[in-house]
Curated annotation (Swiss-Prot):
<comment type="similarity">
    <text>Belongs to the cytochrome f family.</text>
</comment>
<feature type="binding site" description="axial binding residue">
    <location>
        <position position="39"/>
    </location>
    <ligand>
        <name>heme</name>
    </ligand>
</feature>
<keyword id="KW-0812">Transmembrane</keyword>
<keyword id="KW-0249">Electron transport</keyword>
<keyword id="KW-0472">Membrane</keyword>
<comment type="subunit">
    <text>The 4 large subunits of the cytochrome b6-f complex are cytochrome b6, subunit IV (17 kDa polypeptide, PetD), cytochrome f and the Rieske protein, while the 4 small subunits are PetG, PetL, PetM and PetN. The complex functions as a dimer.</text>
</comment>
<comment type="function">
    <text>Component of the cytochrome b6-f complex, which mediates electron transfer between photosystem II (PSII) and photosystem I (PSI), cyclic electron flow around PSI, and state transitions.</text>
</comment>
<keyword id="KW-1133">Transmembrane helix</keyword>
<dbReference type="InterPro" id="IPR011054">
    <property type="entry name" value="Rudment_hybrid_motif"/>
</dbReference>
<keyword id="KW-0408">Iron</keyword>
<feature type="signal peptide">
    <location>
        <begin position="1"/>
        <end position="38"/>
    </location>
</feature>
<dbReference type="GO" id="GO:0031676">
    <property type="term" value="C:plasma membrane-derived thylakoid membrane"/>
</dbReference>
<keyword id="KW-0602">Photosynthesis</keyword>
<dbReference type="InterPro" id="IPR036826">
    <property type="entry name" value="Cyt_f_lg_dom_sf"/>
</dbReference>
<keyword id="KW-0349">Heme</keyword>
<dbReference type="Pfam" id="PF16639">
    <property type="entry name" value="Apocytochr_F_N"/>
</dbReference>
<protein>
    <recommendedName>
        <fullName>Cytochrome f</fullName>
    </recommendedName>
</protein>
Length: 321
């Protein structure tokens, strides 16, 4: 009996510790923001598929500013082969942005590559020395346990990772009938810098703020955390407040009269998100060999026809025709 009681107590103690640890981790995620959780944590939590029916990648919901992203993908690849998908995220050198605490910080970058079904991140034992060198310091994750064809990277220091190499393994339709040879689409997204909107819909301090009310600014208060409160009075004597996060640069001052919609701050954003689509052909070796044989056959046939024609011309010339 004592033994059973001890076993039950020990089990309950372990369960309680596990629950407390889980709660601690959960609160840590929300109360202690970390750069590595900034992307793509929210997209993974909110969206089963990162690409909407319209074709828009959901990262653009928070990173509303647009900037170009480029990608290099082979035109065709063989089955069960490793190839590189290179995502380029260009921006000006030494560019800095406003961090969540209002301080200036270097830009970070991130990328997502949505591969066709069957394509996935190549296992490390199949990486070449060149790929190992090009991916040093880069950590790859898949969007979910079930979607190994969607690969994510970031956030990473932008000054060192303006070009991100994704090592990809193609499927082999000869071994798995679920996949076929043919042409497929690859969807690529690349981002530099923080988002302008939080997943909750609220603006981040990396955004332009406008007045929600008209009136005269009576005072501007600055809190300990750097956030600011703009106090206004309108012509009817009503009082309003505008709350601004830390790090914003004001365009207004005490005593100014502003209209609803007027700019209160400068637009601090220097980053942006971009996406594009690429095509790739999963090539069958048998088809390639068959095509080569076909072209050789056609070429030989043409040569034989030319030789035959010359032979006929010689015979006709000899007979005086």
């Amino acid at each position: 009996m004592k033994k059973n009681f001890y076993t039950i107590s020990k089990t309950m103690s372990r369960s309680l510790k596990l629950i407390l640890f889980s709660v601690f981790i959960g609160f840590s995620i929300f109360l202690i923001p970390q750069p590595t959780w900034a992307y793509p944590f929210w997209a993974q939590q909110k969206f089963e598929n990162p690409r909407e029916a319209t074709g828009k990648i959901v990262c653009a919901n928070c990173h509303v500013a647009s900037m170009p992203t480029r990608a290099e993908v082979p035109q065709a690849v063989a089955a069960d082969s490793v190839f590189k998908t290179v995502v380029e995220i260009p921006y000006k050198k030494d560019l800095q942005e406003i961090g969540a605490d209002g301080s200036k910080v270097p830009l970070q970058v991130g990328a997502v590559v949505m591969l066709p079904d069957g394509f996935k991140l190549a296992p490390q034992e199949r990486w070449t020395d060149e790929i190992k060198e090009e991916t040093q310091g880069v950590y790859f994750t898949q969007y979910s346990e079930e979607q190994e064809n969607i690969i994510l990277v970031g956030p990473l220091p932008g000054d060192q990772n303006r070009e991100i190499v994704f090592p990809v393994l193609s499927p082999d339709p000869r071994k798995d009938s679920n996949y076929n040879f043919g042409k497929y689409s690859i969807h690529v997204g690349g981002n530099r810098g923080r988002g302008q909107v939080y997943p909750t819909g609220e603006k981040s301090n990396n955004n332009l703020f406008t007045a929600t009310n008209s009136g005269t600014i009576t005072s501007i208060e600055t809190n300990e955390d750097g956030s600011q409160i703009i106090n206004l009075n309108n012509e009817e004597g009503e009082s309003f407040t505008e709350n601004l996060p830390a790090g914003t640069s004001l365009l207004i001052k005490e005593g100014d009269t502003i209209e609803k919609g007027a700019k209160l701050t400068e637009d601090p954003n220097v980053g942006g998100f971009g996406q594009l689509d690429k095509e790739i052909v999963l090539q069958s070796k048998a088809r390639v060999i068959g095509m080569i044989i076909f072209f050789i056959g056609v070429g030989l046939s043409q040569i034989m026809l030319v030789l035959k024609k010359k032979q006929v011309e010689k015979v006709q010339a000899a007979e005086g025709i």
